[in-house]
Amino acid sequence: MEPCQLIERSIIKKYRKELWTPFIVAVKRYELVQAGDKIAVCISGGKDSMLMAKLMQELQRHSDVPFELVFLVMDPGYNEINRQKIESNAALLKIPITIFETDVFAVANNSDKSPCYLCARMRRGYLYKKAQELGCNKIALGHHFNDVIETTVMSMFYGSQLQAMPPKLHSTNFPGMVLIRPLYCVREEDIIAWKRYNDLEFIQCACRFTENCTTCDNGGGGSKRQEVKVLLRRLKRDNPNIENSIFRSIHGVALDTMPGYKTEGQEHSFLERFDRVEAELQKELKEKQKQEADKTE
């Protein structure tokens, strides 16, 4: 059996419960793939996007729903070693990648703004644009379960809002394009276990700026996301179910208990509903009093 076949087998067999099953759960629960879709699977070269590419390949092979895949790699300015690593891994995993070049690293690193934020925004814009040029209606990104819960906690601690990472969303700048996150229910620890089991090596953040950056979200000691990772790891010792609780909480928001919320860019207050309910109660009370008065006559 070829190396690629063994790797594919590990997804379907050994790590079926950890990888394949939660992947399928996300695809079905959030309706990520529909008949006729042409999906650009966006590959950064890291473990998450490479696994996502293999999962999407397997889904296409075994699904009754017909859809197309394009495996898109944007080169933002990789050095030769990282570029070769991505290409060799794609060859090993038999992923037919389409590569296109941009100057994202150069622009982001010379900006006065947060380079990591700018890099992420520019990357997504280029991916949307290229995917649209190739006739795709969706792009797939490799955000996983842990990204979801960490983003939720970060928004509370540092963003002063309750905000999650949705499993799919419409692009505001590229009409007709949809972003999907097929790894939404897949845990990072299981991705790492699969990578190690198959003795695979992938690139991490390849930006030269992050080597000495203490505030970037690249997994370094100064990262806010890394702080949240450490916090959740510590809390998990006392409450092993804490990650599931956070994940389920964003699926069961009790909106009626919130003093304020925002939807479709509009802010709302609980007073809107409070006043409406009070008016309805007053109306019901008057009707009841009228009925009782009619009975006594």
Which residues does each predicted region cover?
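A structural signal for well-ordered alpha-helical scaffolds and beta->alpha junctions
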Residues: R16, W20, R83, R124, ...
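A short glycine-/small-residue-rich loop at the edge of a beta-strand within enzyme catalytic domains
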Residues: L118, A140, P182, V186, ...
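Short, basic, helix/turn surface patches
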Residues: M122-L134, K168-F174, K229-S249
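Catalytic subdomain that performs nucleotidyl-dependent activation
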Residues: L69, N146-L232
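The feature marks non-catalytic terminal segments
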Residues: L200-E297
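ATP-dependent adenylation/nucleotidyltransferase module used to activate substrates
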Residues: M1-M154, Y158-L162, P166, H170, ...
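Alpha-helix boundary/capping detector
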Residues: S49, N82, C116, V153, ...
